[in-house]
Amino acid sequence: MVDGFKGHKDSWELTGCTIMTDAWTDKRGRGVMNLVVHSAYGVCFLGSVDCSSERKDGKYIFELVDKCIDEVGERNVVQVVTDNAKVNEKASTLLKAKRPSIFWNGCAAHCIDLMLEDIGKLPLVDQTITKAKSLTVFLYAHTRLLDLMRKFIGKDLVRSGITRFATAYLNLKSLQENKKQLMRLFRSDELNEMGYLNMVKGKKASKVALSDSFWKGVDNAVNFFEPLAIVLRRMDSDVPAMGFLYGCLLEAKNEISAWFDHESSKFQQVFEIIDKRWDNKLKTPLHRAGYYLNPYYYYPNKLDIELDGTFRDGLITCITKMVDNVDLQDKIIQELEQYQDEDGTFAKEIAKRQWKNKNFDPGIA
């Protein structure tokens, strides 16, 4: 490593870091894997590997990651994060056998995107997305019609997201925001005089745009998607995420429930989808410890968190896994009591102001 990495290396040694992999295919069809390190100091690019001719099985991925850990320093690595592909599960098993102090977790953003995808496959949501797409395709298929649409709503209708179903959400949200203008457009003399509504696709688009059931479907789909899309945006940004992931998902479920007046029959399937992905990938000891050690959530929910027990258990698991010095383990537990009682440094007003800020980073504050 060259001197330009000094700031990164110092951060790795002080607060630990995460090794992340990103597999993709370039324009020439070559398989490429990027390897990066994320820490409180920022993101550091370690290298890119052309793996086109390699058998990308668990052993191969493990060996790539294992080499990176040697380069970064095993004591500095808290976790490895990859997507949720099956092949990575084998790699994680091999790593845990060799380096038991390091966690291997699936990418939270990928997991949440899979939740959105599963929700998008629910029959009523899928029908709404299909109708919405047919409506926007019709509006964008004719230059004169597109100009008229922009005149009525004052902007473009279609938006792009970071994933397919994030895009579906953004487009449904855009339709929802412009419902009145679109209904006015399809009832206008200007559109009628253009003749497009006499076409088969025009008649179908008009029927969709003026349908109460369609707009109800849009509202429901947006209410399912939006809370999770907000979590996805946070997980896929530079804003500190690990300490907020568990709490953000709880908030997303509460918001969905509130949208439907807490009538569980209206969102039960969506909750089952969320919980299945969440329970399988995002309720590890590290995620639970992050929630426990984030004062933004801990202090307002202290009683529930302590009574639950699984969050403290997750923290103890992390301590024993990451710290092999028993004296240091005991010191951490002693400091934990100060945290629980909001004593010492935690009692100071400056500390209280920080933890009440949702952009606060519990890892470096």
Walk through the language-model features, giving the residues of each.
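Short alpha-helical patches at protein termini and domain edges
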Residues: M1-A365
